[in-house]
Amino acid sequence: MNVMQENQIKLIAHIKQAVVQAVGLEEAEVPEILLEVPKDKKHGDYSTNIAMQLARVAKKAPRQIAESIVPELKKDNKLIKEVEIAGPGFINFYLDNAYLTDLVPVILTEDKQYGESDFGKGEKFQIEFVSANPTGDLHLGHARGAAIGDSLANIMKMAGFDVSREYYINDAGNQINNLVLSAEARYFEALGLDSEFPEDGYRGADIISLGKDLAAKYGDKYVHTSEEERRSVFRVDALAFETGKLRADLEEFRVSFDEWFSETSLYEENKVLPALERLRENGYIYEQDGATWLRTTDFEDDKDRVLIKSDGSYTYFLPDIAYHLNKLERGFDVLIDIWGADHHGYIPRMRAAIEALGYSPNQLEVEIIQLVHLFEDGVQVKMSKRTGKSVTMRDLIEEVGLDATRYFFAMRSSDTHMNFDMSLAKSTSNDNPVYYVQYAHARISSILRSGKEQGLEVTKDADMSLLQTEAEYDLLKVLGEFADVVAEAATKRAPHRIVRYLNDLASAFHRFYNSNKVLDMDNLEVTKARLALIKTAQITLRNGLTLLGVSAPEKM
């Protein structure tokens, strides 16, 4: 529990006692007291609507109730500096500044752990994201999903959730058959032999490279073997080649997974048919027109869904159900799937399947990643300058940099369309959001280095009561919000809230820096306090950037 949370608990307890004294209720009769941080700092550090909540019980106007509570609140409490009534009965609190300066040694001590909390209470979440077919390069939608999924996992972990990250490898189905046939054609081509390229084949440069690799590895060994033997071998090589490429690209993007789950393993370990039988036992399977159906309309889907076609082949839905059953059987409390915009219509049937399996539909959450459009100098960019083809994740990173790519993709809610301004992302000005935040970190690092050169080290023992300017208090207030912002971003599955916070923190630091001299050799005690203060800002900026997979540079 952080200092701010401790103060909130103390304040709530004090409000409860004031209500008991002023209104004459027993403690157990006092409704839950909610504290909000006013948007306008002129309205205090916290506000509560408890007087409105008590109006019916006390049979009085909320403002009248508030007027009876306030005198009790002012009694014997060092935390509160001032209390006022606003509007119809809101009670606004201004806290004593000592509660802010107490933050500094705490942040210095917690360092990389600052921002952590037990908010999630160890609840087990699995986040499955990216899960692109292993048949080509990652595109911009995958990149946005990767940035958001990885950031969300980092945020939820810091907020006290037990989080596992998973990539579902779609290594079964027609797309893999087409990959193998494409690799086979390029293999023959690399050997100088004629071969008909499959109509639905993959024509990317990576498949040409794969064909050359196969030719170099096997020579003409598989020219005269049976198709079955050749394609069986090439399937293994092609999947290893493509998944290896995906892993490398994601690793470069600072995205890691705890589990790479193979769709093929569902068949090899006989996980598909038991899922079907469970649905049948629960009474939601029926046969019609030679096909096997799942009655998802029982769970608000707009129509029932085919699981096995009349020719005996499975639809994509059946192994997807088996996969989600497997996840739940692994003991996760909640599954978060991060899907592309084209999967929006898939949500009702998947939630219906979860319920038909006997689980709560609330155990599946789906975050939709909306489309990304690239712009440069105000003009939409559709093709890569380098390849003349669609822009890939790799292309974008090479063009604007890894940090800018990660940060920009986290800036907007995932369910909104995104116009990615490459010109802005490459800009070295304060108009560039990631540059603005990173520059604040680098500037602090520079000041700390200068202080060290003059023999001044950051110490927890500095006299923090010397921090008395408005800009210092404003910076401390923003610093104190970090753990709550992390918990809120985790709860709302909203990495963009961390981006917003970092911008606010950088702004608060710049305001402080522009109005306060940090290194003042004629006033060493104040200098020591301010060095400690900016060190806490540096720590918090770094921790926030780390959540987003963005570096915190010492120099720029």
From Swiss-Prot:
InterPro entries: aa-tRNA-synth_I_CS, Arg-tRNA-ligase, Arg-tRNA-synth_N, Arg-tRNA-synth_N_sf, ArgRS_core, DALR_anticod-bd, Rossmann-like_a/b/a_fold, tRNAsynth_Ia_anticodon-bd
UniProt-listed Pfam families: Arg_tRNA_synt_N, DALR_1, tRNA-synt_1d
Residue numbers covered by motif 'HIGH' region: 132-142
CC per GO annotation: cytoplasm
EC nos: 6.1.1.19
Reactions accelerated catalytically: tRNA(Arg) + L-arginine + ATP = L-arginyl-tRNA(Arg) + AMP + diphosphate
Predominant location category: cytoplasm
Record-linked SMART domains: Arg_tRNA_synt_N, DALR_1
PANTHER family registered for this protein in UniProt: ARGININE--TRNA LIGASE, CYTOPLASMIC, ARGINYL-TRNA SYNTHETASE
Assembly, per entry: Monomer.
Family, as annotated: Belongs to the class-I aminoacyl-tRNA synthetase family.
Record-given protein name: Arginine--tRNA ligase
Organism of origin: Listeria monocytogenes serotype 4a (strain HCC23)
